[in-house]
């Protein structure tokens, strides 16, 4: 791997890893195994945009917001996560899961827009570790559907029209229950060494 490829990517999405009766499926290992390539930075008004292996990370320091978009595949649109530090909300559209989600509160492990932008700019062209330092696990609150779609960020609101929207809550840490299910869909967002992940099992 070249020095360019070893540059840590602040945010990247790894979506749709399916585990079928596989108790050895290790999301952290899957994330570590991902290769991160060159990134291209450009500016669009207040938004600073970084293209990473076909994925787009947008940072707005003035609004303290971050958007992470993943390219789609197999006829399915890519997922979009909007981290709004000002409002303390995370909106997440995951087309492969067929639902949208809200997270109330932005974990302190996630860098705000200023920190993220500084990290991107200072790490540009330099080598840095790309290992996952920690993970934030979320599960769907089945009894907490979101009825007001206006809570969703405008960047995902249209994609969430007609879909079920739920609040996500931090996982209790019980990882055994999903292994009893037949199908699991994992969605990941990696933000400067912190893995934000959601697991939905049937």
Curated annotation (Swiss-Prot):
This is Arenicin-1. Pfam families: BRICHOS. Coiled coil: none annotated. It comes from Arenicola marina (Lugworm). The keyword DNA-binding does not apply. Residues 26-181 form a propeptide. Disulfide bonds join 100-160, 184-201. Residues 73-168 form the BRICHOS domain. It comes from the Eukaryota. GO terms for biological process: defense response to bacterium; defense response to fungus; killing of cells of another organism. Has antimicrobial activity against the Gram-negative bacteria E.coli and P.mirabilis, the Gram-positive bacterium L.monocytogenes and the yeast C.albicans.
């Amino acid at each position: 791997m070249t020095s360019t490829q070893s540059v840590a990517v602040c945010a990247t999405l790894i979506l749709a890893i399916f585990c079928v009766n596989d108790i050895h499926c290790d999301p952290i290992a899957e994330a570590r195994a991902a290769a991160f390539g060159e990134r291209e930075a450009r500016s669009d008004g207040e938004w600073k945009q970084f293209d990473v292996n076909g994925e787009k990370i947008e940072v707005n320091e003035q609004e303290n917001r971050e958007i992470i978009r993943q390219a789609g595949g197999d006829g399915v649109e890519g997922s979009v996560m909007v981290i709004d530090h000002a409002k303390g909300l995370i909106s997440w559209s995951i087309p492969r899961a067929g639902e949208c989600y809200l997270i109330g509160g932005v974990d302190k492990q996630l860098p705000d827009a200023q920190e993220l932008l500084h990290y991107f700019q200072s790490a540009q062209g330099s080598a840095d570790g790309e290992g996952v330092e920690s993970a934030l696990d979320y599960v769907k609150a089945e009894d907490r559907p979101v009825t007001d779609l206006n809570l969703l960020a405008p960047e995902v609101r249209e994609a969430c029209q007609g879909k079920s929207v739920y609040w996500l809550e931090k996982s209790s840490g019980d990882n055994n229950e999903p292994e009893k299910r037949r199908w699991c869909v994992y969605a990941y967002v990696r933000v400067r060494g912190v893995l934000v992940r959601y697991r939905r099992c049937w």
